[in-house]
C-alpha cells in the first residue's frame, strides 16, 4: 500500500465533515452571505476538483497566449504558492518587465511571466485585490484565474475544470480521505471540462473519466488537452534547441512526476536515472551538486528538468549541459472559439 493510500485510510472518517463544510461554504456564497466580487471584464477560471497536478499551468499559458494573439490584454492572477512575497498585491510581470524573482513570486507564476511577454502576472492571497489592481491600475481586459475553481470570492464568466486522463477523480473520496477537494456536486458550477494528458492517437477514444462526465453532466462541453513532443531550452545557451544527447539524467519537483518521466521515455531518451522531488521544491547548491554527481555516475551526457524547475536553478552552474523540456500543448476543436466567444459576449 502506498503512503498516500495509508494517509487516506486514516483521514477517511473526516471526509464527510470536510465535504459538508465545503458544501456549506458554497451555499453561503450562492446566497450572498459571503461576498463575491464582480469585475467589469471577463473572468476565466482554470481549476480542478482533484488534488495534485492536472496541467493547469499549460492550459493557463495556452489561454493567455490565445487572448494576446487576438489583441486582448490578459492578466493571470495566482495565489503564488511557495512564493515569499508577502504583499497583498505582488506584480510578477507588468507585461513588459519581470519584477520579481522565482523565489519571491513562486515557481509557476514566474515561469508564466518569463514565457509570456506582454501578459500581466500578479500574485496575492486575496485574489480579488489582485484582480481589482489588474483592471484598475494596469488596464487588464481579461482575467485568468489560475487554480480558481474553489476560489469563490471572485465571480467568473467561464469555469473550466481539468481532470488528468489517467487518474480521473482518484478514489472518489473527499479530502482527507481521498483526492477530491470538494464532493462531486461541485461540478454543477463547471462550464466546461478539459481532460489533460491524452495522446493524439486517443482522440476518438473516450476514457472512463470522459464517459463519467458525459453521463452526469451531458450539457457541459468536453475538450481534450494533448501534450505532444516539443522543444528543449538550453540553460547555458539561453535558447531553444531541438536535438539533445539521448543518454540523460532527469529530475523534477512537480505534482505529477510520472507524466514527465513517461514523456521523456516516449521521446526515446535513455534515462540513466530519475529523481522526483516534492512539488514546489526549493533547490540549493548542494542539492544540484548531488544531482550532477548522480548523473555523472550513471554516464549521463545531459540533464533534463522542467521549465518550472529550471527557473529556480538557473543561477547554479552544472558540469553537464542542463535543459528544460517544453512540450507543446494543443486543445481539441472549438476550445478557442469558446474562450473568444466568452470574451466577445461579455456585457451583452
Swiss-Prot record:
Enzyme Commission code: 2.7.1.130
Keyword Acetylation attributed: no
GO BP terms in the entry: lipid A biosynthetic process; lipopolysaccharide core region biosynthetic process
Protein name: Tetraacyldisaccharide 4'-kinase
Recorded superkingdom: Bacteria
UniProt similarity note: Belongs to the LpxK family.
Residues that, per the record, bind ATP: 50-57
InterPro entries for this protein: LpxK, P-loop_NTPase
Biological pathway: Glycolipid biosynthesis; lipid IV(A) biosynthesis; lipid IV(A) from (3R)-3-hydroxytetradecanoyl-[acyl-carrier-protein] and UDP-N-acetyl-alpha-D-glucosamine: step 6/6
Gene behind this protein: lpxK
Amino acid at each position: 500500500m502506498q503512503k498516500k493510500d495509508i494517509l487516506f485510510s486514516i483521514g477517511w472518517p473526516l471526509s464527510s465533515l470536510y465535504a459538508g463544510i465545503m458544501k456549506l461554504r458554497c451555499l453561503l456564497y450562492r446566497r450572498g452571505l459571503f461576498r463575491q466580487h464582480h469585475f467589469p471584464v471577463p473572468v476565466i477560471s482554470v481549476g480542478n476538483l482533484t488534488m495534485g497536478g492536472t496541467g493547469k499551468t499549460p492550459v493557463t499559458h495556452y489561454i493567455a497566449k490565445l487572448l494576446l494573439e487576438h489583441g486582448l490584454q490578459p492578466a493571470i492572477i495566482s495565489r503564488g504558492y511557495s512564493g515569499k512575497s508577502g504583499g497583498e498585491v505582488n506584480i510578477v510581470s507588468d507585461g513588459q518587465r519581470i519584477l520579481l524573482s522565482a523565489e519571491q513570486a513562486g515557481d509557476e507564476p514566474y515561469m508564466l511571466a518569463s514565457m509570456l511577454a506582454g501578459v500581466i502576472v500578479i500574485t496575492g492571497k486575496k485574489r480579488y485585490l489582485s484582480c481589482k489592481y489588474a483592471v484598475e491600475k494596469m488596464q487588464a481586459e481579461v482575467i485568468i484565474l489560475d487554480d480558481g475553481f474553489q476560489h469563490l470570492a471572485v465571480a467568473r464568466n467561464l469555469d473550466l475544470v481539468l481532470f488528468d486522463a489517467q487518474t480521473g477523480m482518484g478514489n472518489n473520496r473527499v479530502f482527507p480521505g481521498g483526492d477530491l477537494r470538494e464532493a462531486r456536486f461541485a461540478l454543477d458550477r463547471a462550464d466546461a471540462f478539459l481532460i489533460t494528458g491524452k495522446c493524439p492517437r486517443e482522440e476518438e477514444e473516450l476514457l472512463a473519466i470522459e464517459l463519467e462526465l458525459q453521463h452526469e453532466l451531458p450539457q457541459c462541453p468536453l475538450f481534450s488537452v494533448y501534450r505532444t513532443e516539443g522543444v528543449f531550452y538550453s540553460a547555458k545557451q539561453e535558447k531553444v534547441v531541438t536535438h539533445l544527447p539521448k543518454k540523460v539524467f532527469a529530475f523534477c519537483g512537480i505534482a505529477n512526476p510520472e507524466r514527465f518521466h513517461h514523456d521523456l521515455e516516449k521521446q526515446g531518451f535513455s534515462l540513466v536515472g530519475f529523481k522526483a522531488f516534492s512539488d514546489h521544491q526549493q533547490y540549493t547548491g548542494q542539492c544540484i551538486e548531488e544531482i550532477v554527481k548522480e548523473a555523472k555516475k550513471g554516464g549521463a551526457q545531459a540533464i533534463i528538468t522542467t521549465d518550472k524547475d529550471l527557473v529556480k536553478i538557473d543561477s547554479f552552474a552544472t558540469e553537464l549541459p542542463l535543459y528544460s523540456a517544453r512540450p507543446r500543448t494543443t486543445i481539441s476543436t472549438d476550445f478557442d472559439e469558446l474562450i473568444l466567444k466568452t470574451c466577445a459576449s461579455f456585457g451583452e
